[in-house]
Amino acid sequence: MARQDETDCKKLDSNSAFLPLCITSYRSKDEAEKLVSCLHHEGSYFLCFSYGLYTGTSNELKAKVEFALDGPFVVNYATVPMFMSASFCHLLMFNDGSIKGFKCENNKFEIIYDSNVAPKLDTISLLTSSWLNASFEGVLYTCNKNISYDSDLHTLCTTIYSFDFREGIVERFYATDGEEIISFDFISREDLLDDATCTGKSHVYFLCLLKSCYSENLFLKEYNLAGKHGSRKFDLNEYRQYNLLPICDNEFCYMKVVCGHTIVVLTTNYTQIINIKASGLTNGAFFNNKGLPNVENYQFLKDSYDVIYERSVILLTISDVYANKYTAKIHTRSLHRDHVLKELQWTKERVFKPPKHDLCDVILQLPREKYIAVTRINGVNFISKDHRGSKLEKVKSGPAYTNKVYLASQVIGNKGTDIDSLLLGGSFNSRRGFLEKKILVYDKTLFKLVTSSKALVENVTDFWVTDLALNGGDEFAYESGGLIYKNGIFLMDEPYDYGLFVSRTGKVLKAGMDGSTGEFRQVDFLQSNHNSSTMFCYPVQNSKLRISILEAKSGFLRKKEEFFIHGLNSKESIVSCFSDGAEKYLFVIYLDGVFSVWNANQKKVATSHPDYSFIAYDQLIKISWLSKKHKHDSIYVIASSYTGCVRVYKSESNFLRVDLEIHSLYDQKLELLDTIPSLPLVFLYNDKEIILLNLQNMSYGCIQLGLVPRRMRIRPGKALFSLCVLDYDSRISIFEFGSTFYREGFTKQMTSLKPQLENHIFYLPSIPVELYTVPNNLNQAVVCLVDSNSRQYKLMLFNYASMKAVSTFSFSDEKYLHAVVKPLWPEQNSIYLSQRPFYGNKFVVCLGVGEKRTKFWLFEIRNNNITQLYANYLEDCIFSVFIYYECNLVLFSGDSGIAAYKINMLKEGAEILEAYSFPALSSINHIGLPAYMSGDYLVQFEILRDFLRTRFPIRTSIVYPSEYPECPYLGFKRLGSITQVATKIIPKKLREPKNDCLASDKNYLLGRLSDLSCATLKYSNRSYVATIGIDNTLTIYEDSKLSVDKGGLAMPYLKIRLPNKIISLAAIPDGFQNLQICPNFNSQRLEGVIPLFLLCGTEGQIYIISEFIGELWMRTLHDYKKIKLECKRAFRRSEKSMRNVTKQYSVSKETGINESGFDELARNSKRRHIDHSPYKTIDFFDPVKLKR
C-alpha cells in the first residue's frame, strides 16, 4: 500500500508496493535461555534450553553444547534409543525446521545427525511451546500442542508428525479435530504376551489421550497396527474409545505407560489405572487423590510428573513451583478388575527452601537425594540433602536463566540520536516485581588492570605520561596546587591558569607560549615500526589564522610545520589537527557555530551547517581506516559541548553531517580522549561515567573500571595502548587494552567490537503495571504499582540512574478494579512549548476505577516528591482518559459518555478541575479505539469504520501556536479481541534554510536536536495505530485515504502474528533516528529509521517496530526484492531432503528474520489479502538481510 509521496520509488510490478517497516528484537543471554525440557538418564541430568544442551551429575557440568544467540533456537528436545550408530541420541529441533542429533560420550557431546531440510511443522513455534514426543523402533513421533490455534474457529487442531530417520521420510501421522492431545504412546504386543503363537504378528497399539476443546470430556483412543516393520499402517479410522472422568480447562492431566502393560492417568482430583490386554484395555483401579492441593490454577510443574514401576509398586511423584514434592504408592497386588479405592494418600515433602519470592520452573530428582532445580530468579541450582537439611549450590558454568514477564516498557529519552537504553517493569510471580534498565556495556575483560599506585604528591588534579623523559624515574608528571612535579621535583615553579600540557619527553607547554592564543593540542601519529610519535598544534595571534606544529624532542621543542588560513579569527577558534606522520595534515576549526576541515594547502575540505545551539569546547579529528592511501577516507569530527552533548560529524562529499549524538546521562560535560591514530576508538568521560565510542561501526557503550575517574590519559605502546586513570584519591591505575587482540587484521576486530546489553534490576514487593519516563527530569520515571493480594495501588517516583526509589504515594485503602495513569507533559521540547503557563511542571493524572464510580487524582512531580494537588470522585465507571496537553484538557470516557474538564492549576480562586461542555462530544463513540488531536479535529480509529474525524474546536482558546499539534494520550480497557492499542504521530517538520552545504530539495529534522542533518524526511505528518489481538496478532493501520478499500472497510497497513504473548505496547517518542541496541544486525547499529512502537511480553523478548527513511533504504528494498525473485531457486538446498507423502520439503540457507527469533515471517517478499483484492502489502523486512 504505497503512499502518494512514495510514487517516485521504482516498483518491480504493478501489483505490489514496498512497505518500509522493520522489526528488531532484543534479548540478553538470560532472557533468551528458555527451558525446553529436562531428563535424568543413567545417573546424569540433561537440561535443554533454547540455545544449549547441558549435562552433569553435580554442581559442575560435564559437557555442554551451545548455539549462537542470533541464530535459530531449540523448540523441542527428544531422546531416541538405538539411533543410527548411537545407543542413545539427543535430538534437538529448531524453530527454522533444522534438526541436530548428539550423543554424549566421554564427557562431551558429539554431533551424529544434522539436517536443515525438515518441515516447519505448520506454523510459528514459540520459545515456550509445549511438545509431546514418543519413539518407537527408531521413528520419532512429535507434536506441538500450542502451534495450531485457529482464532476464527477457536479450535485446537494438533498434528503428530513421524520422523523416519533411516528412510529420510517425514509424514503427517495423526491430526485431531477440535481436540487437544494430552499424551500419546506406543505399545508392542510382545510386551503384553509371552506366547509363542504371537511370534511374527508384531501387533502395535497407538494410545492417545485427548480432551475436547468444546467440553471437559477426557477420553482415551486405542488404534491398532499390524504388519512387518517398514510396512506397518495404522487404520486411524477404526479405534476403540474409553471415556474417562471429565477435567476442567485449568486442571493438569498426565498419562504414562509403565512396563508395557499398565497405563496411569493422573489428574488433580483422581488417579486411574488401566490395564492393557491383548483383547483391549480394562479398568484396573480408580482413586480419589488426597493430599494434593485442590486449588484452581494451582501451579504444578509440567515436567515433574513421574511414574516408576518397582517390585510390584507403582510410585507416583509430582512437584510444584514452591519446591514441594508429592509422592504416592500403589501396590499392584491389591489391584484387580473394577477395584475402586476411595482415596490415594499423597505425602508432601519440602525439597528445599527457595529464596524469598522465588519460584521453581523445574525440579529434577537425581539418585541419592539429589536434585536439579531451575528457579525463576536464581537460575540453575544443584541441591543435595542430608540429615542437616538441604544445601543449594549454583551450577558452575551453567546457562544464564531467568523467567520473567514484562508488563510495561519505555524507551529512555537520552536526548541523542540513537535508542541505547530501555526501562521495563515486570514480575517473576504474582508477588515479586522488578524494574529493569537495559544499557549497553563493554565486556569487563576488554581492559585488564596492570598496576595501581599512589601518586608521589597529594591532591593531584591532573597528570601526564612522561615515559620518554631522559631522567627516568616515575613515568608521570603531576599537577597539584597549580604546580607541576616529576619525581618530586618542580618542572614549572609558577602557577598557570589554563592551556598547560606536558609532553612524553617531560617538556612543559603552556598557553601564551610562542604567541599561542589557544591550548596546545596533541597530535599523535603512528610510525612504520608501530611506535607512536607526538606533535602539538596551536593557533597563533595574527591577522590570519596561523597554525604551528611543534615536535617535542628530548630537551627542546622544534617547529616542524607552519600553516596559514585566511579569513578566520585565531583568537576565537578551536583548532585540532590530524597527521599521518609524513605527507598529510588535516585541520578542523570550530568558529561561530561551524566546523570546517582544511588541508595543508589552505583548501576547505568539508564544512558543517551552522548551528548556534551547539557550543563546542573541545574537538577531535580522525580519518577512517579503510584506505592506506587516504583516497576514499571519511573524515570524523568529534565535538563536545558544555552541556554534556557529544556530536560525531562524518564527511559526505564536502559536507559534515551529524551522524551520531550522545548525551551524558547526568548532563555533565564529557571530556574527549583520543586513543592512537590506527584505532577508531575515542573515550568520553566525566566523574560519573566512561563511554567508549567505536567509530568503525558507530557503536558506543559504558566502560566499568570500578573507580571514579578524575583525569584519563593514553600511554601508547606496542600492545596497542594502555589507559591511565587518575581517581580522586590521587591513585593512578593502568589498564591494558585488548591484550587478546592481534595487530594483523585489527580493523576487522574493531568492527566486531561492540557493547552488549546489560540488565540492572531493582526488585519490588509489588507489581509495576504502568511506567512513564519524565522528560527533562534527571533520570526519573513515574511507576504505578499494585499489590496483587490487596488490589491496592500506589505511585512511585523512580531514579533509573541510581536504580533507587525516590518517592512514593499510596492511594486510599479502597480496592479498585484497575488504575489508569497518564502523564500531563509534552513529549518534545520547543520554543513554543516553553511559553506555556506551566511549562516545566510535571503533572500526573490518575484514575482508580471501581465498579460504580471512579476516583480522580492530580499529582505534581516537585522537588523529587510526588505531591497530591487534587482528589475527587467521578460518579461513573471510567475506562479511558484522553489528555490534550495544549489546552490542559482531560476527556473521561465512561459508561455515561464523554465528559470534558479543564485543569486550572495556576488560576487563582478557580477549581482545579473545571467542567466544560462541547456539543461535539455527544456524537463521539465513547467506547472507540484510540484517539488523537489533529488540528481542530478529534480523530478516532474504528476497525470497521476507518479513521473518524469529529470537529472539536477547542484550539481557539490557545494563546501560543504549537510546533507539534498532534498529541495522543489515551488509555483503554480491553475491547473485544483487541488487548493493546497505541498511536504514533509522525509530526510535520519545518524545512531548513538553504545553504551552500545542503541540497535544495531535502527536508531535515528540526526540533530538540536543532537539525541533525542526517535524516531526510519526506513522509511526515502521518499517524499510525498499532493493535495487539487476543491471538497475538500485531496490526498497524495508517491514517490515510489509501487505508480504506472499495467497500469502505479499514485495511491494515501491516498484519502479522508474533511468536510471543505481548502484554505491553507503547509509542516511542520522537527524535530518534537510529537503533544502537541491535545485536542481530551484523554488530552495527540500524540507522536511517523512525522508531514507532515498543513491544514486550511474557517470554522476555522485546520488539521495536521502525520505519525506514531515506532513499538508500528505498533502493535497497527495491534491489532486495528483485534479487529475491530472480535468485529464489539458487537459495534452495536439497541435500538429504526428507520426503513427505504430499509435499517436498527444503529449507533455504539464507538468513534473515529467522535469526531474530521468527519463523516463516520472511518466506515471501509479498503477501496478499485474500478477501480484499485491492489490499496488498509485504512482510516486515529484516535489516540484516537487506544489508547483505
Curated annotation (Swiss-Prot):
Organism domain of life: Eukaryota
Record has Transferase as a keyword: no
Keywords in alphabetical order: Membrane, Transmembrane, Transmembrane helix
GO annotation, cellular component aspect: cytoplasm; membrane; nucleus
Principal cellular location given in the protein's record: membrane
SUPFAM superfamilies reported for this sequence: WD40 repeat-like
Transmembrane feature ranges: 73-93, 878-898, 1089-1109
Cellular compartments annotated: Membrane
Membrane topology: Multi-pass membrane protein
Protein name per the record: Uncharacterized protein YEL025C
